[in-house]
Amino acid sequence: MEPRNDAGSILISRILVWVFGALILVLDWAVWPLSQVLMRVLPVFDGGDAVLLKVCLYVCNVPGFILLYCMDVLLRNLHRGQVFESKNVRLLKVISVCCFIACVVCLAACPRIYSLGFVALAAGFMGLIVRIVKNVFSKAIPMRDELDLTV
């Protein structure tokens, strides 16, 4: 069986990380006119909801950009062939914590803006998946070290 070359996939993933970063920046700007449209179109969406939505978005930006940075570093490590390394486990841990922070922020705003409950659910589920992958990586590192010593 030939070894796979995932350089193309890693490059696409890195490009998508940067695209998502750009989209977050666009959303940071677009939330102002978008919230005005929502107040006109949805009768249940008032000025207080618009402020809460903006606060929620800007608070979630901090873990969001940290998450994107960690994903980019992780992809660079994978491109270099550094897969089962403790620094990748740390990056995965930070990524999962960022997901959980976004989940908590959206849950806090959920009683007022119900649709943020779906965002909270998605962020929490993503955090759980990344946390499980982190646990797999952390178990694989000692196994790899033991295998390296055996060979």
Residue ranges and their predicted role:
Residues 17-28, 64-70, 100-106:
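Helical transmembrane-bundle signal
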Residues 90-115:
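Hydrophobic alpha-helical transmembrane segments of integral membrane proteins
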Residues 22-35, 127:
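Alpha-helical transmembrane segments of multi-pass membrane proteins
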Residues 71-78, 129-151:
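Cytosolic juxtamembrane helix at the C-terminal end of the final transmembrane segment
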Residues 29-61:
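Membrane-helix boundary elements
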Residues 65-86:
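Membrane-helix interface/capping segments
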Residues 112-124:
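Short, aromatic-rich membrane-interface segments at the entry and exit
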Residues 1-27:
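Cytosolic juxtamembrane helix and N-cap/initiation of the first transmembrane helix
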